[in-house]
Amino acid sequence: SCSRLSQWNVCKILMTKAIIIKKQGGPEVLELSEINLGSPGPNEVKVKNIAIGLNYIDTYHRSGLYPVNLPSGIGLEGAGKIIEIGSDVKDLTVGDNVAYAGGTPSAYADERILPAQLVVKIPDGISHKVAACIMTKGLTTHYLLCKTYKLNSKDVVLFHAAAGGVGQVFSQWAKSIGCKLIGTVGS
């Protein structure tokens, strides 16, 4: 409890606003809360979010289709500035513009702590908004094109839901490889 002013000031510094869920359900289960975030561990960074990505998987976590331990934060991807680093983090510094995807759901927050290995620097010319919304789609596309099946220029690909987020990234990436792409879309 932060009953004294000096304690309140310390607690205020450690507190951040976050959307959390305490039970599964519709949008009505989303709660704005103040949480004590603390400081990053040795291999972690604290990021002040500037933009977050909204994904279907967030609704799956919220509804219980993809169960999470409750109470839980929500959201997997975002972008912002590093405001604190752990003692063993070497390739990132305070002030770096970064994006991330993954970790425990908690992107819907002013700040969050992440393993440094989940964070990438944002290249010059890419906004926080673009970086925040492309991470999960880009990683999914990379997995499909490079891990599931190594696509080459002689391949013909049928991609369902080509107008969706992953479909748009996949289509452009597949085209850059030189393969023939056939895309379907819903009505």
Placement of each model-derived feature along the sequence:
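Glycine-rich beta-strand-centered segment in the early N-terminal region that forms part
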Residues: 36-53, 63-106
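Adenosine-nucleotide cofactor-binding segment
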Residues: 175-187
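N-terminal Rossmann NAD(P)H-binding glycine-rich loop of SDR-like oxidoreductase domains
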Residues: 163, 171
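NAD(P)H dinucleotide-binding glycine-rich loop of Rossmann-like/cofactor-binding domains
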Residues: 98-161
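Hydrophobic/small residue at the entry helix of a nucleotide-binding pocket
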Residues: 166
